[in-house]
Amino acid sequence: MKNYKKKYLASKNLPMEVHEKSTFYGRRCLYCYEPLFESNSDFHEACNKRFFGQLKTPQLAYNLENLQELATQVIQSQMAVTGVQAKVSLSLYRKQEKNLTKKLTIVGLYGDYILKPPSEHYVQLPELESVTMHMAAVCGIKVVPHSLVKLQDETLCYITKRVDRTRKGKLHMEDMCQLSERLTEDKYKGSHEQVAKLILKYSSSPLLDVSNFYEQVLFSFFTGNTDMHLKNFSLLEKEGQGLNLCPAYDLVPTALVNETDTEELALTLNAKKRKLKYADFLAAFENGGLNKKVLDNTLELFLYAKPEMLTVLEKSFVSDVYKMKYAVLIESRYKQLGLK
């Protein structure tokens, strides 16, 4: 994790007005959230290059209505990417002239990108997933490449780049459902301690990956993510490096969009999913071969990172109402573990 201790302590001594939120962000890049001053695009050229591999934003020739129709057809033909949330697989159309801006097209299972349109049931899912991924990144948690992108009708969607695909082919990747030999429908049955044991068994960097895994678990707790089930943790094999914990993906603050859910984590932690305390995380850490010092150091780093998380939240595309709700949620979860 990143260490913001010096910045955190310095900010404590600043006059109050320095802490006030900026009221102007103007047009911002959908990839990095930083201002766009001269471009008519929704991305900086460098951000386009980094995420799409070209200087111009690819054309996404769908509006929300026909995208949902196509997504339904894909699901019915069993080509959709697995998961409850509607999502489709995309690739850049390669049969175009080199000087033309490439299009993103639906390709079934074997695309390079996964697109998630807005939900019919939950508000602002793309914006909330995007900012949560950004918050994880500022904490120093590795995340898969991701961005927001606009459809033709200006609807915002969440898009992520697959990490198990390269120009050379497919990389070996197994989620915890597969490694524990459970059926997909049993993805909520299990514990974080069982996942840690699987990481210790199969990872080429076992203790480091268990530590990184519990950083993701703590982050999920702090951000109200109750959907980090067995399929949302994976091991990814890179050439010559063996299997290691996959960068974080599917980070959604479900507690914000589904207020009826009283659970705090998707899998059990110290045999609990609710009313989690410091002692529960300590028991889980120790069960995975990590000691109290590792937990305390990790929590300290999360404390120092909180202002950075809230700054990212303020710059995001989330509505003001949900920015406030999200900030309150984060504050309450920090206090629940004794962090202030």
Predicted regions, residues:
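A residue-level signal for conserved active-site and pocket-lining positions in enzyme catalytic cores
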Residues: 90, 136, 176, 227, ...
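Regulatory N- and C-terminal appendages and interdomain linkers associated
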Residues: 1-68, 72-75, 287, 311-340
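C-terminal regulatory or interaction extensions
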Residues: 171, 177, 252-260, 289-291, ...
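ATP-dependent phospho-/nucleotidyl transfer catalytic cores
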Residues: 152, 157-222, 267-271, 283, ...
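Conserved kinase catalytic-core segment
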Residues: 120-137, 186, 191-256
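Short linear loop/turn motifs
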Residues: 149-155, 295-305
